[in-house]
Structures are given as structure tokens and as C-alpha cells.
């Protein structure tokens, strides 16, 4: 499996329907298909994916989105969140955000929105504003971290 397989799956019509409203069946499907890829990514084995915009995006999806499905309701769902933030920041530094489409950008920036670091929150709000996205959610996430120092 390569990064293109992750991109094709995540941005398919079927998957799009479950980006923010998953089901136990979808969570299980992702776990069955991608848990071994997640393990490889978590070990650093897939760091070479960072050499391209699509590869970075796929790595972020594997590290940030898939664990939320595969390990829903457990601490393990956040285990690779920091790694996803690092990949996102590197991608932005390489100007990959200027290459990806709108849907892809949303997931490129998502690790920053999930971060409990206020600097990351400020970066994602600026990026949402730069690309003229609906920034209501991005500001809401930042305000929670600003107020509580973390997500309650």
C-alpha cells in the first residue's frame, strides 16, 4: 500500500460521508484496512511520504484521522497526534498548502486544530482565514485551548 491508496480511500464519495459522522462499521473498516499502515507510520517507517504534497497529506490522515476512527474513545486515538502536527508544519513550511485543493487543505490543517498548543491553534486560525474557509470551528477550537489550556 502506498500514499495514493490512502488518498483514494479518504477522498472517495463513501468516505467523505463519514468524515465527521462515522459509524462503528466505518471505524472497523478503517482499522482492518489501515492499522498496519498506522503502526508503520507511528514507527517513522513512512517518513519518506513527506517528500510530496500528497504523501504528506496521506501521512497526516494516517497519523491524525485514522486513529480517531480505529481507537475511538481511547487514549490511543491521540497517540500519533504530535507526529501529525510535525508533518503538517513541515508541509506548510514547504508551501504544500499552495498546491493542495480545498478538501485536502482541511485535512492538512486538521492536526493543528486538534493540538492543545495555543501556537498551533493560532497558526490554524490564520490558515483558515488565509484560504477563506469557514473559520467558526477553527476559532472555536482555539478559544477552548486559550481558555482551558487543553480540550476538556
Q: Model-found features: residue ranges?
A:
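Intrinsically disordered, low-complexity activation-like regions
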Residues: 1-73, 78-152
